[in-house]
Amino acid sequence: MSCTRMIHVLDPRPLTSSVMPVDMAMRICLAHSPPLKSFLGPYNGLQRRHFVNKPKPLKPCLSVKQEAKSQKEWKSPHSQAKKRVVFADSKGLSLTAIHVFSDLPEEPAWDLQFDLLDLNDISSSLKLHEEKNLVFDFPQPSSDYLSFRDRFQKNFVCLENCSLQDRTVTGTVKVKNVSFEKKVQVRITFDTWKTYTDVDCVYLKNVYGSSDSDTFSFAIDLPRVIPTEEKIEFCISYHANGRVFWDNNEAQNYRIVHVQWKPDGVQTQVAPKDCAFQQVPLKTELEPTVFGSPRLASGLFPEWQSWGRVENLASYR
């Protein structure tokens, strides 16, 4: 074998010159031999095999794409369980509900057994019972200041005001300060002076008063049942310096009388059975009075009598 042929064997690329059959057979034989094929292969084949057998880079354990895909599937409404419709008969229940109504009417309630119209007719046919009440049979003493001051100067004791509420009589008494030790009592009777009771009064501290007079208060509970034929009267006694001063409303006593409320709203006084009571007829017209007269002022504005003169604002003298 010549050198030229050896070069041809080592270099399988075709030559420009003519190739002999022996050379072709030699190439075919050498090409099918594994050791020589791997050794005599072209550089391009070696380079291609090197890239094929090169190890690939490792992939991360956590796949971001798969995590995003799982989140997308979790947020997607298709991932929720589908709703199913189950009928009652599939579980052994009835498909219909039966309600039975009775033709008999129910018993009416006791508080609704009457209609409003029936109640109106019944109330119009009823007669109102006469209700007995107790009222004072005297005006408030301090309403007429001039008269009150005169009586106070003369008797040294005088009832100032009085009220009746819930069958309890309360009031205040004015007395002259003639001594340090004083005793004021209210003597009251509920059976036309067959018996009487003395009730002690309580001293009240005068904040804006003078040293010439003192004020006492009292509270008397009336009996629950008082016959209409019996009189309820009281007076006031004042003990000072061994003397007793009385205020008995100019010898008439202070009276509490029974009255009856008629269905028409008129209030009439009940007269005792043992005496003849004459009721003064009501005046149909008011008597004309001079504007600014004491009678008109005392009836409408009793305090005007004390506002008109400065000396009336002083203590009772």
Curated annotation (Swiss-Prot):
Domain (CBM21) ranges = 149-257
- Sorted alphabetically, which PROSITE patterns does this protein's record hold? CBM21 (PS51159)
Query: According to the UniProt entry, where does the motif PP1-binding motif sit in this chain?
Result: 84-87
Q: Does the keyword Ubl conjugation apply?
A: yes
Which GO biological process entries does UniProt record here? Answer: glycogen biosynthetic process; glycogen metabolic process; regulation of glycogen biosynthetic process; regulation of glycogen catabolic process
Q: Which GO terms describe its cellular component?
A: cytosol; glycogen granule; protein phosphatase type 1 complex
Q: Does the keyword Ribonucleoprotein apply?
A: no
Pfam families in the record? CBM_21 (PF03370)
State the source organism's domain of life. Eukaryota
| Gene3D superfamilies for the chain | Carbohydrate binding type-21 domain (2.60.40.2440)
> Region (Interaction with EPM2A) spans which residues?
141-263
Q: Which GO terms describe its molecular function?
A: [phosphorylase] phosphatase activity; enzyme binding; glycogen binding; molecular adaptor activity; protein phosphatase 1 binding; protein phosphatase binding
- Quote the CDD domains the UniProt record gives: PBD_PPP1R3C
Record PTM = Ubiquitinated by NHLRC1/malin in a EPM2A/laforin-dependent manner.
Q: Which UniProt keywords apply?
A: Carbohydrate metabolism, Glycogen metabolism, Ubl conjugation
Disulfide pairs?
none
What InterPro entries does the record point to? CBM21_dom (IPR005036), CBM21_dom_sf (IPR038175), Pase-1_reg-su_3B/C/D_met (IPR017434), PP1_3C (IPR030683), PP1_regulatory_subunit_3 (IPR050782)
Q: Function of this protein?
A: Acts as a glycogen-targeting subunit for PP1 and regulates its activity. Activates glycogen synthase, reduces glycogen phosphorylase activity and limits glycogen breakdown. Dramatically increases basal and insulin-stimulated glycogen synthesis upon overexpression in a variety of cell types.
Subunit (UniProt): Interacts with PPP1CC catalytic subunit of PP1 and associates with glycogen. Forms complexes with glycogen phosphorylase, glycogen synthase and phosphorylase kinase which is necessary for its regulation of PP1 activity. Also interacts with EPM2A/laforin.
Domain notes per entry: The N-terminal region is required for binding to PP1, the central region is required for binding to glycogen and the C-terminal region is required for binding to glycogen phosphorylase, glycogen synthase and phosphorylase kinase.
This protein is called: Protein phosphatase 1 regulatory subunit 3C
